[in-house]
């Protein structure tokens, strides 16, 4: 795992075998999944994940039924199932392409840099990856919305993806962000 993280951080990968060493450019995004019930990851490793999305099981019966129906439909005919969503997927892909091109135009006011630092301090995050990740994510949210300037609301939304896995907490705590802290800083 450490080798992957090093390659992701440096943008270079070194392969060594039988006395031969080869280094080449390596640009990739690491995407992982885990089940917290199977154990915890080291904090140093968690800090390397830019964002975390906590996926909970659906509790609404009608939505669960829809999930089951979708899965069965996909298993029966994957091509037909994918065609049903092709237009929606193409629109989303175009929105992402447009945002990627627009991203360099998105500005972050100095006030947001300060707020990001204050939020990270208030939530007890170690290091600076949380601050930087929150700013990058806020810019991305603004780009997706077609705005030229990141806002406090973008920063607040970004914090929910970037900070929970970085917060210092006891093993028995949930990692949920206390909303009153965020509101106090942003007010």
Model-assigned labels for residue ranges:
Residues 52-62:
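Conserved AAA+ ATPase "SRH/arginine-finger" region at the nucleotide-binding site
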Residues 4, 33, 49, 116, ...:
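Conserved RecA-like P-loop NTPase ATPase core
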Residues 15-33, 47:
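AAA+/SF3 P-loop NTPase mechanochemical coupling elements
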Residues 115-132, 140-187:
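C-terminal engagement/docking regions of AAA+ P-loop ATPases
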Residues 1-8, 40-48, 61-66:
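Conserved AAA+/SF3 P-loop NTPase catalytic/coupling segment centered on the Walker-B
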Residues 105-116:
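Acidic catalytic patch
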Residues 1-21:
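Conserved catalytic/switch belt of AAA+ P-loop NTPases
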Residues 66-105, 119-122:
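Conserved AAA+ ATPase "sensor/coupling" helix adjacent to the nucleotide-binding pocket
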């Amino acid at each position: 795992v450490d080798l992957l993280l090093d390659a992701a951080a440096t943008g270079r990968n070194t392969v060594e075998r039988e006395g031969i060493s080869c280094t080449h450019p390596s640009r990739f995004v690491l995407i992982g999944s885990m089940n917290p019930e199977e154990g915890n990851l080291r904090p140093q490793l968690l800090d390397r994940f830019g964002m975390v999305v906590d996926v909970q099981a659906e509790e609404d019966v009608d939505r669960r039924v829809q999930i089951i129906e979708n899965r069965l439909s996909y298993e029966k005919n994957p091509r037909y199932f994918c065609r049903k969503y092709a237009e929606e997927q193409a629109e989303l892909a175009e929105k992402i392409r447009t945002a990627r091109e627009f991203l360099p135009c998105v500005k972050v006011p100095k006030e947001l840099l300060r707020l990001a630092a204050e939020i990270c301090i208030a939530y007890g995050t170690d290091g600076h990856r949380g601050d930087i990740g929150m700013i990058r994510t806020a810019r991305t949210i603004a780009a997706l919305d077609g705005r030229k300037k990141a806002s406090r609301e973008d920063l607040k939304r970004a914090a929910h993806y970037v900070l929970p896995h970085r917060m210092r907490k006891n093993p028995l705590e949930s990692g949920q962000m206390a909303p009153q802290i965020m509101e106090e800083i942003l007010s």
